[in-house]
């Protein structure tokens, strides 16, 4: 019987939309109202051809707030729909209200310049969309937000949202970790533009390059030139990797204001990656940390192979905790825990984090997951639930360790931001600009964008444009 009500409701709505020009725009098929979600409502498609790619992504991406255009709606009636979980229907038409239907409809006329507020429920969160018809008419003052409402994650199951921080800092490692093992040398100008685009997207930290021997990583031989070009950028910190004192001195001479050091929880991997044992590497890094302190340069620590090693296999959490504590004691303000070969799952990540958090505060820790086995987002989620609020990621999913076979594929920054948006977590990152940056570098490298979110959103925009 309920299905009969749905069919009757559909029929009534079709007639209303067909016979009443004030209820829909003539350029939009009636069927469109019954196939789209609450985030795919008709939004003045006549403006779409003149919009840039980035504007389209911002206007139609899942986290974007998109005010209606009064020209597209003909200065007429605005339809609002509230999804409910009940089987009753509330409507002005009494006969229509008798039928069982899982959503209700109401209409009202908006005066030009009147503020419109709509609640859109999507992916377990509610966003308040506000805008004025006068402002949206000119497209000059549109503002897009990926933030949830003041209730935060109140619409998400407590089992998921429990312990998740309200704000997560994203550390972008694409220009360094993402490009370091590319076989074809990327021009310095492309690297510089990529960094500029990433900073423009709102990312607070963008790891720019590495002052390592060109013999080991020829892709980053232009480290000084890159730093010379980006040192004047405002809005983000631009740390560089320095494997030893010589690299640190070169970085400081090039104007670096923050550096990073790289240790391993695996003895075998330490020997193959930085050509020394764990203890030898820690001794080397104490020298770097001391020099950095003298120059008032902050030092970030990395620990690789925190759950598994390509040579030794599983790594004990106690070994990870030991290395992390050593880096913390020598002065690292933040330590990033890297699953270098992407073998970790929540089942192995949680014990590792428990061991590390027993010796170092959670707010001093970051996570750095590779998506080799498709586990990165799941691992990030459990890390957030345990109190971690700093996540490393790479634009378009670029990169991996050149010394770890099969480790290609850092988790894509776009995918991380998309997931965090869905959780109601703030990042201050513009997803549209982020996707544009990923498309830029992917096009230059001649490969598809490795971000699933970016590919899906780009595909949806293309599909919407084809309907015009």
From Swiss-Prot:
Active site: 401
Protein keywords: Lyase, Metal-binding, Mitochondrion
Chief location bin: mitochondrion
Taxonomic classification: Eukaryota, Viridiplantae, Streptophyta, Embryophyta, Tracheophyta
Pyruvate carboxyltransferase domain sequence ranges: 168-435
Protein source organism: Arabidopsis thaliana (Mouse-ear cress)
The EC number(s) this enzyme carries: 4.1.3.4
Record's subunit section: Homodimer.
Role noted for this protein: Involved in the catabolism of branched amino acids such as leucine.
Binding site for substrate: 176
Keyword Mitochondrion (UniProt): yes
Pathway as given in its UniProt record: Metabolic intermediate metabolism; (S)-3-hydroxy-3-methylglutaryl-CoA degradation; acetoacetate from (S)-3-hydroxy-3-methylglutaryl-CoA: step 1/1
Identification of the protein by name: Hydroxymethylglutaryl-CoA lyase, mitochondrial
Family of the protein in this entry: Belongs to the HMG-CoA lyase family.
Keyword set includes S-adenosyl-L-methionine: no
Necessary cofactors: a divalent metal cation
Class of enzymatic activity (EC top level): lyase
């Amino acid at each position: 019987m309920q299905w009969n009500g749905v069919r009757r409701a559909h029929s009534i709505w079709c007639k209303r939309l067909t016979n009443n020009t004030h209820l829909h725009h003539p350029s939009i098929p009636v069927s469109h109202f019954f196939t789209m979600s609450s985030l795919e409502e008709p939004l003045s498609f006549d403006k779409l051809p003149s919009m840039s790619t980035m504007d389209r992504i911002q206007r139609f991406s899942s986290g974007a707030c998109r005010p209606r255009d009064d020209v597209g709606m003909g200065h007429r009636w605005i339809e609002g729909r509230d999804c409910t979980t009940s089987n009753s229907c509330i409507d002005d038409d009494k006969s229509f209200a008798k039928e069982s239907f899982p959503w209700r409809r109401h209409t009202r006329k908006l005066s030009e310049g009147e503020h419109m507020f709509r609640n859109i429920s999507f992916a377990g969160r509610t966003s308040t969309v506000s805008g004025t018809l006068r402002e949206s008419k000119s497209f000059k003052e549109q503002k897009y937000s990926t933030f949830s409402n003041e209730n935060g994650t109140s619409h998400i199951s407590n089992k998921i949202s429990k312990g998740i921080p309200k704000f997560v800092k994203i550390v972008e490692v694409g220009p360094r970790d993402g490009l370091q093992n590319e076989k074809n040398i990327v021009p310095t100008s492309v690297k510089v533009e990529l960094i500029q685009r990433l900073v423009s997207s709102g990312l607070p930290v963008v790891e720019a390059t590495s002052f390592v021997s060109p013999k080991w990583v020829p892709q980053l031989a232009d480290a000084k030139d890159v730093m010379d070009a980006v040192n004047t950028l405002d809005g983000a910190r631009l740390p560089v990797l320095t494997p030893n004192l010589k690299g640190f001195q070169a970085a400081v001479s090039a104007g670096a204001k923050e550096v990073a050091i790289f240790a391993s929880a695996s003895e075998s991997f330490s020997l193959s990656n930085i050509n020394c044992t764990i203890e030898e590497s820690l001794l080397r890094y104490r020298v770097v940390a001391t020099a950095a302190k003298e120059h008032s340069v902050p030092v970030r620590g990395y620990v690789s192979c925190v759950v598994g090693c390509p040579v030794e296999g599983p790594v004990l959490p106690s070994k990870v905790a030991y290395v992390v504590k050593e880096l913390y004691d020598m002065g690292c303000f933040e330590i990033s825990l890297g699953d270098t070969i992407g073998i970790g799952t929540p089942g192995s990540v949680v014990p590792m984090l428990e061991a590390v958090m027993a010796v170092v505060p959670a707010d001093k820790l970051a996570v750095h997951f590779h998506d080799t086995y498709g586990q990165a987002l799941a691992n990030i989620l459990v890390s957030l639930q345990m109190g971690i609020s700093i996540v490393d990621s790479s634009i378009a999913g670029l990169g991996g360790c050149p010394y770890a076979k099969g480790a290609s594929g850092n988790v894509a920054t776009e995918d991380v931001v998309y997931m965090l948006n869905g959780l109601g977590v703030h990042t201050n990152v513009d997803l549209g600009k982020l996707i544009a940056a990923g498309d830029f570098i992917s096009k230059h490298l001649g490969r598809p964008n490795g971000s699933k979110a970016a590919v899906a959103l780009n595909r949806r925009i293309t599909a919407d444009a084809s309907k015009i």
